A protein has these predicted regions:
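Glycine-rich flavin
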Residues: 2-14, 30-37, 42-179, 212-216, ...
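Beta1/beta-strand and adjacent pyrophosphate-binding region of the FAD-binding site
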Residues: 8-24, 179-189
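N-terminal Rossmann-like FAD-binding beta1-loop-alpha1 element of flavoenzymes
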Residues: 14-41, 192-201
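Short hydrophobic core segments
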Residues: 17-19, 127, 141-151, 185-186, ...
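Glycine-rich dinucleotide-binding loop and its adjacent helix/turn
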Residues: 56, 150-205, 209, 237, ...
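FAD-site-proximal beta/loop scaffold in flavoenzymes
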Residues: 163-179, 265-341
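Structured beta-strand/loop patches that form or line metal/cofactor-binding pockets in enzymes
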Residues: 363-380
Length: 380
């Protein structure tokens, strides 16, 4: 692997350009190199992408720590036992999480690149697509095929005042220097559910707020069972509502919602938005070359992972497909094989597994009941 962070005017001779150095980008680049192709892997910022840096790895490390706190206190369920654990040094716990992230990023990403001589890693600023290649900083890279794997980022919901209160997201929550006494979580999907329970077990008073209900993508019975478990642990759930306003004053952050036609206010030290993510497609020149995106900016791809422009593919969180790290790597591998080998692999998520790292854990494989009915299948 050669690091080409220099200012040549143009570098050609590549068979494939991969934009993004996360799980999808690495999967695509390695697949291309294994096929004997010369690959330019274009990163921007910290190598490794969402999962290892700010997603799966740090959140699961903290969830595991919170489990230790909870299980110690749960010993009293058994006659003759008692136990108690608490967070004595939040900053040390956060630092241990950061150390784990650094170690895994090095082992799983940075140390892997030198094994692939046909992959040139380039980190010289954001890339912009042009006809037949991309521009990166002051340089132009040329290749007949390009795979976009630039990932996604957290976004704030549209609530009056939310831009002014210093709202946290799933990344900044785990970077707090001081453990808060109370938190409001907006969004009750799998990210919100995992982080809300984790912080509650750390001793934080948690209110979880959602327009619909907890885990809206799960079966209703599962959602209800998990909601009961959360409430038994002291988490306050506010669901079936609309957001009105949010403000910050000396008392903290106050969120006002409308529930059953009546205003309800809840106050906490911070508000954490886990209400969704958006694709990293801004300023990439997609419109100029005709790459179709949906209303949220995600790149629309076919079953072969190709975009609306021939020769340009996309995979991972930047697309309108499944937002899981293993599906990102899977889709990127298909895209690379189709792009550089001319094969016709098709994205298939019919038996896709998924899991929510709550307690109790929630997992599934394939279609849910509602999805199966929508697909015209007989459900008993």
């Amino acid at each position: 692997m050669k690091d080409l962070n220099k200012n040549d005017d143009e570098q050609g001779g590549y068979d494939l350009i991969v934009l993004g150095a996360g799980s999808a980008g690495f999967s695509a680049a390695i697949t291309g190199a294994d096929a004997g192709k010369r690959v330019a892997l274009v990163g921007h910022g910290t190598i490794g992408g969402t999962c290892v840096n700010v997603g799966c790895v740090p959140s699961k490390a903290m969830i595991r720590a919170a489990e230790a706190v909870h299980c110690a206190g749960a010993a009293k369920r058994f006659p003759g036992l008692s136990g108690r654990a608490q967070v004595d040094d939040w900053q040390t716990l956060v630092q241990s999480k950061d150390d784990l992230v650094t170690t895994l990023r090095q082992k799983k990403y940075a140390d892997l690149l030198p094994e692939y001589e046909d992959v040139d890693y380039i980190d010289a600023g954001p890339a912009r697509l042009i006809e037949g290649g991309v521009t990166v900083g002051e340089r132009t890279l040329k290749a007949p095929r390009t795979i976009i794997a630039t990932g996604g980022r957290p976004v704030l919901p549209t609530i009056d005042g939310i831009e002014e209160i210093g709202a946290l997201n799933s990344t900044s929550l785990l970077e707090l220097e001081v453990l808060p006494k109370s938190l409001i979580f907006i969004g009750a999907g799998y990210i919100g559910a995992e982080l809300a329970q984790m912080m509650s077990r750390m001793g934080v008073k948690v209110t979880l707020v959602a327009r619909s209900h907890l885990l809206p993508g799960a079966e209703p019975e599962v959602s209800e069972a998990l909601a009961a478990a959360f409430e038994a642990e002291g988490i306050t759930l506010l669901t079936g509502l609309s957001y009105d306003t949010v403000r910050r004053d000396d008392a903290g952050v106050t969120l006002r919602v409308i529930q059953n036609g009546k205003p309800v206010e809840v106050t906490a030290d911070h508000l954490v938005s886990t209400a969704g993510r958006r694709a990293n497609t801004k300023d990439m020149g997609l419109d100029a070359i005709g790459v179709e995106t949906d209303a949220r900016g995600s790149i629309v791809v076919g079953e072969d992972m190709q975009t609306s422009v021939r020769g340009i593919y996309a995979a991972g969180d930047v697309t309108d497909r499944d937002q899981f790290v293993y599906m990102a790597a899977y889709g990127a591998k298909l895209a690379a094989k189709n792009a550089v080998l001319g094969e016709d692999h098709r994205y298939d998520n019919a038996a896709m597994p998924w899991v929510v790292f709550s307690d109790p854990q929630v997992a599934g494989v394939g279609l849910g009941e509602a999805q199966a009915r929508d697909a015209g299948l007989d459900v008993k």
